[in-house]
Amino acid sequence: AITENLQREDVTPREEAAAYKRALESGRHTIESLVGKFGKSETYIRSRLKLCDLIDALAEQLDREEISVGVATEIAKYNVEVQQEVYEEHFSDGCRLSWKNARIKEIARRLYDRYMTRLDTYRFDKTECHTCHHNTANQILFKDECTDGCAGCQNRNCMMRKNDEYL
């Protein structure tokens, strides 16, 4: 049934994300098996899965095509509190500082600058961070593009715990 749903021409990004999530939760599939089955890249499937983490208000805007999949994916990388704040300040009706017409890269930069904690500013051992999915350096398609300063931690609680332990 999942395969049939994903082969429909009118499947929305969130329906696609939900189908991937159901397939994974069924225990019959892994990310790797979905890559093989649907001919999509691992990065593509993981980015679609992030759409399941969107707050309702942003998910509804995505469904109405008021925001793009790329914008929704960038915002979905952040926790619920950040998403709610971003929605209220930049995507809600009547907001004063709308980001609705900004390009994806610009939104990603704004989110990073405002809500991300750069790993290179901390001195604790970052060995675990090198493979952590909360490390933004592990979320980019071409790792060669990641030079100094692009590794950011999206899990502030974990990062603060590591820093406290170091200190």
Predicted regions and their residues:
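Sequence-pattern detector for short linear motifs
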Residues: 25, 43, 51, 106-108, ...
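Context-gated lysine
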Residues: 21, 37-40, 50, 77, ...
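Cysteine-cluster motifs in flexible loop/terminal segments that predominantly coordinate metals
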Residues: 113-166
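C-terminal helicase lobe and adjacent C-terminal extensions/tails of nucleic-acid helicase motors
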Residues: 90-114
